[in-house]
Amino acid sequence: MVLQALIIFFAQLIYVPILTLRTIMMVKGLKQKAAAMGMLEGVIYVVALGIVFSDLSNYYNMAAYALGFGIGLYIGAVIEEKLAIGYVSIEVNIPQKNQPLINRLREMGFSVSSSSVEGMASTRCRLDCTARRDREKEFIKIVSEYEPQAFIVSFEPRNFKGGYITKAMKKRREKYLKRKAKEDAH
């Protein structure tokens, strides 16, 4: 009885993070990875739910299912945050152009564009950057060191075309295809 509840609980701890990541992969357009995760998810789901449905009078199993689901959601969110899949667009609004800041961001590999914008009371400087999500905190830390009062907003772009990032992605893709062709030739 307790063993079944433990199996259900631990199955949920595996199932729900996979469910979370699969959903994110689908949203990000990573269909093949999402499909592979979906197959694994399906097997775990059927096993855990099968045990619960085998004895609906066993409240321990139902509690283990619900508790595992809740904790699994938390674990899935933590894993997703650590993986930081995808890209983020970051806008920075500062009182005036700060060339040392721009130079530092570029030295660190960030693609930064700057422009003058009309604020409520004055002309201000806006910095725009699209970067990998796993570098967002690094970007914000650098900006905060140079401009502690900066207004920073970030969001996930639905899609993008051209620019510094797509050139780099294209180069990585070409390297991958060359490497794959060499492996296939052997």
Curated annotation (Swiss-Prot):
Transmembrane as UniProt keyword: yes
Membrane topology type: Multi-pass membrane protein
Ranges annotated as spanning the membrane: 1-21, 34-54, 59-79
Record keyword Cell membrane present: yes
Pfam family, one: DUF5698
Gene Ontology CC annotations of this record: plasma membrane
Record key words, sorted: Cell membrane, Membrane, Transmembrane, Transmembrane helix
UniProt cross-references to InterPro entries, sorted A to Z: DUF5698 (IPR044035), UPF0316 (IPR022930)
CDD domains: YitT_C_like_1
Subcellular location(s) of the protein: Cell membrane
Similarity comment: family membership: Belongs to the UPF0316 family.
Name of the protein this chain belongs to: UPF0316 protein ABC1774
Organism of this sequence: Shouchella clausii (strain KSM-K16) (Alkalihalobacillus clausii)
